[in-house]
Amino acid sequence: SKGLVGLVIPELSNPIFPMFAQEIEQLLASSGHTPLLCTQTPGGTSEDEYIEMLVERGAAGIIFVSGRHADTSGDVTRYQRLRERGVPLVTINGNAPTIKAAAFATDDRAAARIAVEHLISLGHRRIGLAIGPMRMVPAQRKHSGYEEAMRSGLPDEPLHVVETLYTYEGGANAAQLLLPQGCTGIVCGSDIMALGVIQGVRSGGLRVPEDVSVIGYDDSPLIPMTDPPL
């Protein structure tokens, strides 16, 4: 083996994270590295504890997926210390500006902009955005793309943004807040959140997509099998 590489990811309940883990582990294995999956759960091993364990084991590098590196209000000294120790690190899904590391992410801003433009093309005028905490880089980028498209395509229409959690329950809560504002199109920050929005729409006696259009984000493998498929 060329060395141990740690893969630190959030909980596995969101299907997008097992997808990340599988793809990254396959790439590491094919390059001769030994992947070590480190999952974070409430009350479980923390990111800092995983970092110390990996450093003690002489890890050849650490990959962080959707972790504290994306929190603009968080403490980033842990990543600076890794660099000082000579441990290579890579971040995936957003990087706070103060972190100096190889960073990879989808274009959240462009995705949100395209989603809004699509809804506008369908005739929607009151379009809502359901995203996670705004201190996180991906949420900031999605908000920027949403606002850009709204200002360009619907300059007289107010913004309708709900900041919630990237969970099914968070999506359902967002729907309960956006529907009374008259939103007929809702862009979501994740697929799991979108499923919650759909349930919230139905709980309000409305139909998807006949009454309300919903767009998710992640391209999770099970999403095409939902009713309706996202």
Model-identified regions with their sequence ranges:
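Short, flexible loop segments at the rims of nucleotide/cofactor-binding pockets, characterized by
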Residues: 39-42, 66-70, 105-107, 166
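Bacterial carbohydrate/catabolite-sensing allosteric modules
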Residues: 26-31, 55-58, 76-230
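Residue-level signature of the cytosolic catalytic core of signaling kinases
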Residues: 1, 13, 71, 166-167, ...
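Short gly/ser/thr-rich secondary-structure transition/capping motifs
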Residues: 45, 71-73, 198
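Short, flexible, glycine-rich and Lys/Arg-enriched loop motifs at helix boundaries
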Residues: 65-81
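Short glycine-centered, acidic/aromatic-flanked micro-motifs in structured strand/loop junctions
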Residues: 7-9, 66, 131-132, 207
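Amphipathic helical "hinge" segments at domain boundaries
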Residues: 1-61, 68, 137, 144-147
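Short, conserved acidic/polar surface loops in the N-terminal third of protein domains
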Residues: 18, 47-48, 73-75, 101
